[in-house]
Amino acid sequence: MNPPDDLRAIFFYGKLEDNWIGHQMAEIWKDGVYRPFLPLIKEGTVALDIGANIGLVSLYLSKYFEKIISLEPSEKHFECLNKNLVGHNITNVKPIKKALFIKGGPLPFGGPSDNTTMRSLHTAPWQDSKSDATVECITIDKLFEDEKIERVSLLKLDVEGSETEIVSSDSFARVADKIDCIVGERHAWSGRHPHQLDDALKNNGFSIEKILNDANLFVAKRK
């Protein structure tokens, strides 16, 4: 399945060769990573696109969910996210310029100079990776409270190394039973072993369904 005909020009930040846009579009539309979860969508629930980047997943899911909340802390990527939503006349996605983490407040944020897509609260293991900005953070239970979220059918979690900390946190435990399914990406370079993420998910009532591809995308569903 290729991107739909009504997918218009995509705004992105940086050089095309430094981005994973082609890979991401193939993953979403051709490989259909999110397609198996569409039948699980329950009326009145929302989707959370955490680490929305330029909004490709939000664009895809906007056709199926009544409401999507998209978090993206990077200034440049957030600008592109907004432009892509406006350019495609998407009105059911709420973009929020924050990072999801285990505590709120401002924190240093950065990444390697040759990869404009890779931005993280963690220092990646590349020689030139450095923090070059400060971003506002929010915990997941505070996000639920602020946005009055009752139920999440799908949580997309791509937080560049913070996934284990988030899923292991007390704030996640407080809302875990309101989440039906998680599609996320593992980042072993954060210093966490993959089994720590698996254990945290299981402790919060999720079962690991499968690893989807070589990008270490995982699927976890509520037991």
Residue positions per predicted region:
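Phosphate/nucleotide-binding beta-alpha loop and adjacent structural elements of enzyme active sites
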Residues: 1-223
